[in-house]
């Protein structure tokens, strides 16, 4: 199955949705009239009008952050053997963890938000240490005005693969009460954001996306880190080549292979 984006139009607003391909997850919403700021592009990406919408909510820690990380089996088998990360309570100190993704297009430095999304970081670091991401392709590039991301982390390379387990959403989803209508309203995921793709609530696995231009998404995608300036330059170069075959969503025209991902 090829990667796909769900496009939903409501009240004149169009949102492209980041998903694991097997999902049928739909989101809708109307953007507000504020603008988030983010690091400027340093390459030849074509200029576009800034997206407008409310910013991600501030992180307010709760006693439950990192207190009980669980990784139950997913409905789909593992695309590559990975085992299960440490379960139960995980440390939120240090607050930030450095990790570098090395690709055949350059190095992408990450600062993982261990204090905000520790269960996600725990899984991501575990997968990296087990070489799970090594020799995998970043299978999806989106270049739409409201969604500009590179999606990676699938060992199958077609948008359907995962580690064989799943886990709950963290920041920013956990900043809202369950069932809050605001969870369906787009917010700005700023340039430089590292977040998880999913197939609906609580279905995080191994697929993640990197935002190279401010994008509008509902706050249903766990943010677990930031991309450094050098990494954004690499992403800009990949994005400037566009999508294979044209269009705004599909495999990147410049193939991207992760050769390694390791904690700094």
Where are these regions (language model features)?
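Cyclophilin-like peptidyl-prolyl cis-trans isomerases
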Residues: 2-8, 12, 17-264
């Amino acid at each position: 199955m090829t990667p796909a984006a769900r496009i939903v139009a409501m009240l004149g607003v169009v949102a492209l949705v980041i998903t694991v391909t097997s999902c049928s997850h739909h989101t809708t919403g109307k953007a507000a009239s504020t603008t988030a700021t983010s690091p400027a592009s340093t390459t030849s990406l074509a200029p576009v009008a800034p997206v407008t919408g409310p910013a991600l909510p501030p992180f307010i820690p709760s006693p439950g952050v990192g207190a009980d990380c669980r990784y139950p089996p997913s409905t789909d088998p593992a695309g590559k053997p990975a085992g299960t990360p440490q379960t139960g309570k995980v440390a939120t100190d240090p607050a930030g963890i450095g990790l570098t993704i090395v690709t055949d297009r350059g190095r992408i430095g990450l600062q993982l938000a261990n204090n905000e999304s520790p269960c996600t970081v725990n899984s991501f670091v575990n997968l990296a240490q087990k070489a799970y991401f090594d020799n995998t392709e970043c299978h999806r590039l989106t270049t739409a005005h409201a969604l500009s991301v590179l999606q990676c982390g699938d060992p199958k390379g077609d948008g359907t693969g995962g580690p064989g387990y799943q886990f709950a959403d963290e920041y920013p989803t956990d900043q809202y009460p369950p069932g809050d209508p605001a969870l369906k309203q787009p917010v700005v995921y700023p340039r430089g954001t590292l977040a998880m793709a999913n197939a609906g609530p609580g279905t995080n696995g191994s697929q993640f996306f990197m935002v190279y231009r401010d994008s509008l998404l509902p706050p249903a995608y766990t943010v677990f880190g930031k991309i450094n300036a050098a990494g954004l330059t690499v992403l800009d170069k990949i994005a400037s080549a566009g999508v294979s075959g044209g269009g705004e969503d599909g495999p990147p025209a410049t193939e991207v292979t992760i050769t390694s991902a390791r904690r700094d």
